[in-house]
């Protein structure tokens, strides 16, 4: 049956948001075209007919960029879009996180949500349009989904909050917050900020949630009008008789095992109990071992959550608001420009800071305006950090997301290009993992920059907060470890300085949390951050006053912008010659600022002298000691300084008549000449005769 096309509109932050259904991608379970300004995103949701035999919910969320959306053709030989950009990967995670908690417990059908950006307006966020589209595609489909959800961007300009700020407004904003949630609660936060106090961040989140409620009402109307009836699906459930039987065999032993303080010893104790129980069912073909295993994990989860919420006991014996033992060190690696090692319990990160010339910036060319990035933070998570083996691959979504979070946390304290004309790359190597590795990498990266001599505005530390909510019992945990993250309800990462917050990231596994829990988590995080900063500053109290001897030295000079082409030369001939002769890197800005960099200060100075000679202006009436470079019948060409020469006509070589140029000068001779004129073609006319006359006149006056 042919679906009827429907269109719905609402004003969203001063721009029109339009949703179209029933025309595109009609074979998907749900599909909508979302138009926001001139941005257009097609969002679809599909699900497998049968559940998968998996211990987890197989959900995939993809945000896909098409360069035609920005009127661009992909580069390279293939001329097709390649692997997703970092922005697309982060957008996929941004949409996935608020959607994932809202599917029924035990739902195992494979679900795929895809948003394709088909047209992009830089002032109308395609990510926010895709989030609304993904929620709507699920809401109008027959796939079980306890939404809708919505998300908005919040900025703050001159103390006033702004919904979905434009590009120009974002430049002036000290907050860049994305908040998502349901009508009743918030379930995802992602933010960067310029040392903003916790109470302001909380108000920004609540301000965003008020706008979310309006968008959800809009979606509910659409779903009521065009939505399909939800399919009755089989939710995975365990046999209650089997569960009771397994509990009798394992419950008491597992309760003791989960309270072993050390991570690996605790894992070994839990696995020993599980293996013992599983062995009793190995010969029983009527009982699936996967189901027994699921029951055993359920018992562990219940006991850990009960201990935390009711008895206020954590797996490693800490208090609810207690941080694990801390250690901070710098200068770990001798030849790197800066290094920092941060350890928190059984989580350890080693960060390395590398300084480069401004020519080492990363060029970002996607759907947005081409930009360059001079500060980068990369995060690596090798398998040995958790004592396991596994394939070695490039960075996945998680690594890219954690690297971006660290970058967002540290960016507000990076010195300006004028104050510190370097490209800065940080690489965080996670060496041990037991929760909060992204926050450990932020602490280690701060230490590495201070060790490298980067004049950061203030040190930054990060901490991860957790939540376990069971009936009327609620516990907000400071500095969560791996088990608390896996079995808890929230992972709320907060990074900042003593002054305020620089980054937030919140993911939850329940439908949402309220203001009171957010407020408590932010305050506990602030207190924890102060303790961590104290520990870091014991290792290094301020950035080193000098850079590493192995870091490039950068010399800055300014020339007349009109002279830039002279420094570059035809087809880059001049600048390439300077680089070849001195071994330096040269970066030239449009305003005439030149950055010369190398490890050798002498070579920097040599390159500067060459450039100074190139841009030096010849002044009429001035005398110069030049070198004869070429001889013609009509005169001699004399180089006054590097890149600038002039002609001494044969008649201007001497006071007496000259028959042959070689009678007076030869190539390589140094002669004193005077600039007589510069013609309208820029040619310089010189005279040796005028110099001789002035010298003769001066001698006569001295004799008198």
Curated annotation (Swiss-Prot):
InterPro entries: ExoRNase_PH_dom1 (IPR001247), ExoRNase_PH_dom2 (IPR015847), ExoRNase_PH_dom2_sf (IPR036345), KH_dom (IPR004087), KH_dom_type_1 (IPR004088), KH_dom_type_1_sf (IPR036612), NA-bd_OB-fold (IPR012340), PNPase (IPR012162)
Pfam family, one: RNase_PH_C
Catalysis performed (reactions): RNA(n+1) + phosphate = RNA(n) + a ribonucleoside 5'-diphosphate
One cellular component term from this protein's GO annotations in UniProt: cytosol
SMART domains the UniProt entry points to: KH, S1
S1 motif domain sequence ranges: 621-689
Cofactor requirements of the protein: Mg(2+)
Tree of life domain: Bacteria
Domain KH: 552-611
Gene3D superfamilies xrefs: GHMP Kinase, N-terminal domain, K Homology domain, type 1, Nucleic acid-binding proteins
Key words, A-Z: Cytoplasm, Magnesium, Metal-binding, Nucleotidyltransferase, RNA-binding, Transferase
Broad EC category: transferase
UniProt family annotation: Belongs to the polyribonucleotide nucleotidyltransferase family.
Known function: Involved in mRNA degradation. Catalyzes the phosphorolysis of single-stranded polyribonucleotides processively in the 3'- to 5'-direction.
Name this polypeptide is given: Polyribonucleotide nucleotidyltransferase
Lineage: Bacteria, Bacillati, Bacillota, Bacilli, Bacillales
Gene: pnp
């Amino acid at each position: 049956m042919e679906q009827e096309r429907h269109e719905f509109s609402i004003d969203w932050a001063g721009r029109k948001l339009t949703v179209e259904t029933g025309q595109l991608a009609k074979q998907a379970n749900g599909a909508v075209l979302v138009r926001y300004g001139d941005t257009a995103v097609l969002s679809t949701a599909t699900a497998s007919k049968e559940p998968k035999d998996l211990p987890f919910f197989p959900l995939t969320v993809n945000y896909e960029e098409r360069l035609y959306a920005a009127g661009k053709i992909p580069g390279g030989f293939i001329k097709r879009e390649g692997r997703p950009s970092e922005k697309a990967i982060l957008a996929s995670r941004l949409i996935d996180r608020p959607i994932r908690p809202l599917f029924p417990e035990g739902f195992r059908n494979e679900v795929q949500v895809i948003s394709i950006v088909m047209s992009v307006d830089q002032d109308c966020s395609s990510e926010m349009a895709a989030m609304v589209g993904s929620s709507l595609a699920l809401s109008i489909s027959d796939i079980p989904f306890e939404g809708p959800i919505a998300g908005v961007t919040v900025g703050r300009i001159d103390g006033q909050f702004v919904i979905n700020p434009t590009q120009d407004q974002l430049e002036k904003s000290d907050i860049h917050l994305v908040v998502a949630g349901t009508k009743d609660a918030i379930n995802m936060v992602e933010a960067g900020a310029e040392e903003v106090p916790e109470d302001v961040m909380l108000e920004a989140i609540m301000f965003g949630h008020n706008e979310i409620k309006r968008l959800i009402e809009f979606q509910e109307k659409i779903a009521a009008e065009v939505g399909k009836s939800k399919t009755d699906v089989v939710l995975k459930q365990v046999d209650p008789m089997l569960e009771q039987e397994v509990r009798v065999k394992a419950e008491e032993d597992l309760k003791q095992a989960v309270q072993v303080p050390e991570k690996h010893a605790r894992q070994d104790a839990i696995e020993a109990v599980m293996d013992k129980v599983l062995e009793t069912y190995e010969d029983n073909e009527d009982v699936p071992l996967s189901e027994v295993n699921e029951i055993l994990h359920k018992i562990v989860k219940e006991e850990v959550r009960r201990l935390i919420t009711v008895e206020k006991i954590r797996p490693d014996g800490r208090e609810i608001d207690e941080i694990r033992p801390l250690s901070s060190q710098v200068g770990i690696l001798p030849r790197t420009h800066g290094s920092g090692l941060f350890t928190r319990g059984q989580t350890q990160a080693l960060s390395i800071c590398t300084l480069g010339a401004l020519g080492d910036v990363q060029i970002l060319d996607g759907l947005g305006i081409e930009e360059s990035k001079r500060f980068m933070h990369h995060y690596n998570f090798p398998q040995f950090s958790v004592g396991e083996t596994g394939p070695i691959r490039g960075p996945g979504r998680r690594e890219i997301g954690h690297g971006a979070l660290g970058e967002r946390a540290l960016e507000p304290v990076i010195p300006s290009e004028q104050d510190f004309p370097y490209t800065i790359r940080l690489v965080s190597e996670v060496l041990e993992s037991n929760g909060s590795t992204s926050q450990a990498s932020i602490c280690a990266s701060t230490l590495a920059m201070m060790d490298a001599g980067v004049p950061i505005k203030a040190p930054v530390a990060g901490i991860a907060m957790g939540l376990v909510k069971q009936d009327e019992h609620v516990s907000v945990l400071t500095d969560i470890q791996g088990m608390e993250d896996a079995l808890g309800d929230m992972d709320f990462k907060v990074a900042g300085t003593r002054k305020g917050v620089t980054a937030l990231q919140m993911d939850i596994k329940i439908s949402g949390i309220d203001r009171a829990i957010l407020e408590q988590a932010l305050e506990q995080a602030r207190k924890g951050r102060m303790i961590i900063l104290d520990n870091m500053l014991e290792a290094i109290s301020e950035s080193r006053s000098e850079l590493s001897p192995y870091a490039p030295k950068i010399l800055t000079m300014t020339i007349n912008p009109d002279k830039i082409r002279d420094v570059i030369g035809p087809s880059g001939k001049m600048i390439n010659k300077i680089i070849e002769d001195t071994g330096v890197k040269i970066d030239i800005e449009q305003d005439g600022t030149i950055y010369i960099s190398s490890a050798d200060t002498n070579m920097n100075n040599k390159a500067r002298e060459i450039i100074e000679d190139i841009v030096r202006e010849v002044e009429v009436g001035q005398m110069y000691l030049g070198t004869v470079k070429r001889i013609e019948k009509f005169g001699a060409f004399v180089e006054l300084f590097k890149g600038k020469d002039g002609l001494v006509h044969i008649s201007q070589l001497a006071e007496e008549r000259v028959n042959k140029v070689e009678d007076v000068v030869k190539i390589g001779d140094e002669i004193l000449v005077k600039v007589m004129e510069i013609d309208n073609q820029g040619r310089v006319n010189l005279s040796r005769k005028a110099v001789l006359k002035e010298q003769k006149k001066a001698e006569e006056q001295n004799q008198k």
